[in-house]
Amino acid sequence: MMNHPHSSHIGTTNVKEEIGKLDRIRISGIGLVRYAFMAVLLIIAISTKTLPNTMIGAIFALVLMGHVFYYLGAHLPIFRSYLGGGSVFTILLTAILVATNVMPKYVVTTASGFINGMDFLGLYIVSLIASSLFKMDRKMLLKAAVRFLPVAFISMALTAVVIGIVGVIIGVGFNYAILYIAMPIMAGGVGAGIVPLSGIYAHAMGVGSAGILSKLFPTVILGNLLAIISAGLISRIFKDSKGNGHGEILRGEREDAAAAAEEIKPDYVQLGVGLIIAVMFFMIGTMLNKVFPGINAYAFIILSIVLTKAFGLLPKYYEDSVIMFGQVIVKNMTHALLAGVGLSLLDMHVLLAALSWQFVVLCLVSIVAISLISATLGKLFGLYPVEAAITAGLANNSMGGTGNVAVLAASERMNLIAFAQMGNRIGGALILVVAGILVTFMK
């Protein structure tokens, strides 16, 4: 019996229609069918160890994992509503894949090499800082910075005192709570935070820094995770509050901000211009850090951009170029960076080994205290409380640059990265100085 010629045509049409329906589901701009094909390709590459240990291999793995995990987290009810959405889900799931040995170690090495070794993180952060600062109105930027820094520093100081007092109440002692919870959680991350902090402690105590570092690392991990979750919660709970600036940090300046943030049409040449200018500021910060090693490079980067903006040293064409490049990086690489954080920085084994109820309580106290204090002070200093709590508060409990990105991604406030970095880097440097003095008396 012969098939009717129309039957095969109808079957082909139905398949195409089904594929078309699936392709309407888009993950970061890519249809589901095409995404599934690339995902299968990635799984085969990883399982056959043919994923290149290069920038290309890292980008392919991190972008695909980051986008799909973020998509899932953003659509899962509990994560979406209460646990920081796609940002937290991406970081947690990639960290769990590593902890359970589902993800091979060579993939972790490839991801870490791209983010830290090749310093893609540095490019991402400087692009974001430059973009967000140049996008702001000049007068508004200076007014916001002058009000923001006192809020950040006072919040950190008061939070440390609260942690110490709670440490006494729950039986671990004031000194322990300050040295092993307050200082590391607000020190500015790992490389610029607890690594030099462990050296300071080790020198004062006459012990090896490796043992000290193993005690400090869990604090940074849990503090970072709680900060990300809290940022998502705060932005959601206070969504309709008068204290929510919806991404604007300075109260009463929304009209000026809207005028300053006019739409910039994409231009291929300007994207390249924006890239090299962003890198130029990174080089300025790096070179000044070599001359003054006691001051973090990002502090110099922020200062150089603020001065450039304040004195109008860059024509609008170049400012727009930087803004444009920063937007491209944020929209396309944020999820990849979050996946990289989970793969290479969030060690679940270390975190679980350190868990005790006192440890968890003190980390929670740090999060709650710095959120409430910074929100209250922010309101007094003319900032929106929600934005103050996230940038002057929670960002100072995060894991440095990567933590700031995750905190702001969870709260959908990536445009405030400059303020998060400002408080985190300058505040972190102050923490190291204060810790160096305190450890002499508290050891």
Swiss-Prot record:
It is found in: Cell membrane. Disulfide bonds: none annotated. The record marks 425 as: Plays an important role in the generation of the membrane potential. One of its GO terms (biological process) is citrate metabolic process. The chain crosses the membrane at residues 27-47, 59-79, 83-103, 114-134, 151-171, 177-197, 209-229, 268-288, 294-314, 322-342, 350-370, 388-410, 422-442. Uptake of citrate is not affected by the absence or presence of Na(+) up to 25 mM and is increasingly inhibited by increasing Mg(2+) concentrations. Changing residue 425 to K: 10-fold decrease in affinity for divalent (S)-malate. 4-fold increase in affinity for monovalent 2-hydroxyisobutyrate. It is a multi-pass membrane protein. Keywords: Antiport, Cell membrane, Citrate utilization, Membrane, Symport, Transmembrane, Transmembrane helix, Transport. The keyword Nucleotide-binding does not apply. One of its GO terms (cellular component) is plasma membrane. Induction: Induced by the presence of citrate in the medium. It catalyses: (R)-lactate(in) + citrate(out) = (R)-lactate(out) + citrate(in); (S)-lactate(in) + citrate(out) = (S)-lactate(out) + citrate(in); citrate(in) + H(+)(in) = citrate(out) + H(+)(out). One of its GO terms (molecular function) is symporter activity. Belongs to the 2-hydroxycarboxylate transporter (2-HCT) (TC 2.A.24) family. NCBIfam families: ccs (TIGR00783). Secondary transporter involved in citrate metabolism. During cometabolism of citrate and glucose, catalyzes the uptake of divalent citrate into the cell coupled to the exit of monovalent lactate, a product of citrate fermentation during citrate-glucose cometabolism (precursor/product exchange). The citrate/lactate exchange is electrogenic and results in the generation of a membrane potential. In the absence of glucose, i.e. when no lactate is produced, CitP catalyzes the proton-dependent transport of citrate and malate. The 46 C-terminal residues contain structural elements that interact with the R groups of the substrates. Interchanging the 46 C-terminal amino acid residues of CitP and MleP alters neither the specificity nor the affinity for the di- and tricarboxylates malate and citrate. In contrast, changes in substrate specificity are observed with monocarboxylates. This is Citrate transporter CitP. It comes from Leuconostoc mesenteroides subsp. mesenteroides. The lineage of its organism: Bacteria, Bacillati, Bacillota, Bacilli, Lactobacillales.
